[in-house]
Amino acid sequence: MAAGMKGKRSRRRKERKNVEHGCAHIKSTFNNSIVTITDSVGNTLSWASAGGLGFRGSRKSTPFAAQMAAETAAKVAMEHGLKSIEVYVKGPGSGREAAIRSLQAAGLEVTLIKDVTPIPHNGCRPPKRRRV
């Protein structure tokens, strides 16, 4: 770095987008749930995850944690003027339905629910079975 320069980065203030319709992408795995709300183009408005909200360990994978993540993401997205969403659900986790219900309860109108879980046509070898 130059002699007079400090390690300071100028941070741009987030501009307030005004979006009526968007998409909610819910990724629910066996270990965590991530909710991302985007506009119709795909630019992220807000996101939240169960782990980011302070849930740790086995509590991260609960439906309640997914519900809280969806609620948090919905509140921030509604500040951008969001009113209706299409929901895309991915993964086998337990928080799928809870997250969708939470988005509806937050005051967003759900226009479409679609399962976009990737299904292999005999691709990679799955992990070995757990023996407990």
From Swiss-Prot:
Residues 1-16 have a biased composition (Basic residues). Part of the 30S ribosomal subunit. Interacts with proteins S7 and S18. Binds to IF-3. One of its GO terms (biological process) is translation. InterPro entries: Ribosomal_uS11 (IPR001971), Ribosomal_uS11_bac-type (IPR019981), Ribosomal_uS11_CS (IPR018102), Ribosomal_uS11_sf (IPR036967). One of its GO terms (molecular function) is rRNA binding. It comes from the Bacteria. Located on the platform of the 30S subunit, it bridges several disparate RNA helices of the 16S rRNA. Forms part of the Shine-Dalgarno cleft in the 70S ribosome. Belongs to the universal ribosomal protein uS11 family. HAMAP family: Ribosomal_uS11 (MF_01310). Residues 1-20 are annotated as: Disordered. Gene3D superfamilies: Ribosomal protein S11. One of its GO terms (cellular component) is ribonucleoprotein complex. Keywords: Ribonucleoprotein, Ribosomal protein, RNA-binding, rRNA-binding. The keyword rRNA-binding applies. This is Small ribosomal subunit protein uS11. The lineage of its organism: Bacteria, Bacillati, Bacillota, Clostridia, Eubacteriales.
